[in-house]
């Protein structure tokens, strides 16, 4: 797989608010090339929305590989939280990207910059490596 998607990236994609490079990046990860955490599914589907938006979100998520809360992910998330104050969902998403050895595509780069070994890609950047 190419990269790991943060919840905010998926939400921006759903709303069509990513610039063209970000839209192309996310689209390039469809059908087995990118992954997201089960936490992102909870974050994206777990709020009040129209049936149309919910269906669009479910359809989008089905294009990527969902990763679960495996022991290595949980252990890595615990390690991250023991080193610095970080929200549980962010710790799980970062841990998932680390365990699966994928760059994390997120606009919240400031939340993750301190994590050694985690490559970050901002989907709202004008150019994406």
Map each language-model feature to its residues.
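Nucleotide phosphate-binding site architecture
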Residues: 10-11, 45, 113, 121
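Acidic, PIN/NYN-like endoribonuclease modules and their adjacent C-terminal/linker elements
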Residues: 1, 94, 98-129
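Acidic catalytic patch
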Residues: 43, 62-83
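Short, conserved catalytic or interaction motifs in soluble domains
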Residues: 15-16, 66, 117
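Alpha-helix capping/helix-boundary segments
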Residues: 9-10, 40, 73, 92-93, ...
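Short, well-structured N-terminal submotif of metal-dependent ribonuclease cores
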Residues: 1-36, 46-62, 127-129
């Amino acid at each position: 797989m190419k990269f790991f998607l943060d919840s905010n990236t998926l939400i921006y994609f759903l709303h069509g608010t990513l610039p063209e490079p970000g839209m192309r990046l996310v689209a390039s990860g469809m059908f087995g090339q990118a992954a997201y955490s089960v936490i992102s599914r909870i974050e994206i589907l777990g709020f009040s929305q129209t049936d149309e938006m919910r269906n669009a979100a479910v359809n989008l998520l089905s294009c990527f590989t969902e990763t679960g809360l495996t022991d290595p992910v949980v252990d890595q998330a615990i390690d991250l939280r023991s080193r610095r104050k970080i929200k549980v969902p962010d710790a799980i998403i970062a841990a998932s990207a680390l365990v699966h050895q994928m760059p994390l595509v997120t606009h919240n780069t400031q939340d993750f910059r301190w994590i050694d070994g985690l490559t970050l890609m901002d989907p709202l950047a004008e150019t994406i490596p």
